[in-house]
Amino acid sequence: MANMDANHKKIKVPWRWRLKAWWEGYDVADMEARLRARGGKASYKELTQKEPEPPAEPVEKVNWDALRIEVSQLIWGDGYCGPGGPENVVAMSKLLALSPKHSAMVIGAGLGGPARVLAQEFGVWINGYESSAKLAAAGMEMSKKAGLEKKAPIYHQDLENIEAFERNFDRALAKEALFTVRRKDNLLKVVHTHLKDDSLFLITDYVIRDMDSLQHPDVQQWLSQEPHDPHPVTSDMMVQSLEKAGFRIRVNEDITEHYLDMIAEAWATADQVVKLLSRQGPEASDSLNAIMREAQFWNRRTKIMRSGELKVCRYLAHKPAVIR
């Protein structure tokens, strides 16, 4: 036994491999442990290759239903199902230089909060397009109740297979919507076609650090929980798709930190919502469970934002006038 231990200790990583490993940033102690585990027989490549990431635990999709729609608004505000309430929408939309003379489309309209605030604040005529039938129906009902069914209607639209919009617009806004679309080039080309000359298109969206991020267990969990299968790309790929569609990029900025601040601010008041619901007794248990599911949903998103695997970026794209 003692002889076996002595032989085990004699197994060392050759010096020429040590030097190469130090230069390339590998852990020599880890390499030595692997070499001993293999009885001293292994190639340099075998000793330095990355261990496969553990498989991600399966996560159920968090689909939209009446209860989730209700709970989301308790967290994010009436008409909103994610970060960025009226003040944020107005502030970010100043890049669009909106006026009552303009018409605009909102891609990924959600419950219609952003569309309605733009119509009310700037007098713009809005068409909102949402890929979730349940969100679109609820959003249209809210527009009707606000007396904005004509100025800010919300329509259900299959963004994956869209071929045309029913009219042309002066402005466009896509708020965290493109990451759910696989055929981005097609959608962006259709948007470009239905924007008038010298129009602006404002986009905020989730983008990944690089394509390897898709293999990260935490990213895979995030992908599996989304109600619509996500197809995120890198920021460079997003810019390339916009330019391919015919747009010129005026703004390209990482707003992840600001986005995380908005998430934290909204959830800071969630404990008050939980306290109020708790006082209602057993009949509030479904709502409380829904809030916990929503918290887990957003925790998975924020986790990969903080690690840098996922980012939120803002783009302002311009459709130049055609010289005739």
Identify what each model region corresponds to.
Residues 82-100:
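Conserved alpha-helix/loop element of class I SAM-dependent methyltransferases that forms part
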Residues 206-229:
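Short, glycine-/aromatic-enriched active-site segment of Class I SAM-dependent methyltransferases
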Residues 163-172:
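A short acidic, Gly/Pro-enriched loop at the edge of an enzyme's catalytic core
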Residues 2-61:
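N-terminal auxiliary segments of SAM/dcSAM-dependent transferases
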Residues 185-200:
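A short glycine-rich, Lys/Arg-flanked "PGG" loop and its adjoining helix->strand segment in the class I
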Residues 105, 114-161:
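Class I SAM-dependent methyltransferase SAM/SAH-binding core
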Residues 101-110:
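Conserved class I S-adenosyl-L-methionine
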Residues 8-16, 30, 251-324:
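Conserved Class I S-adenosyl-L-methionine
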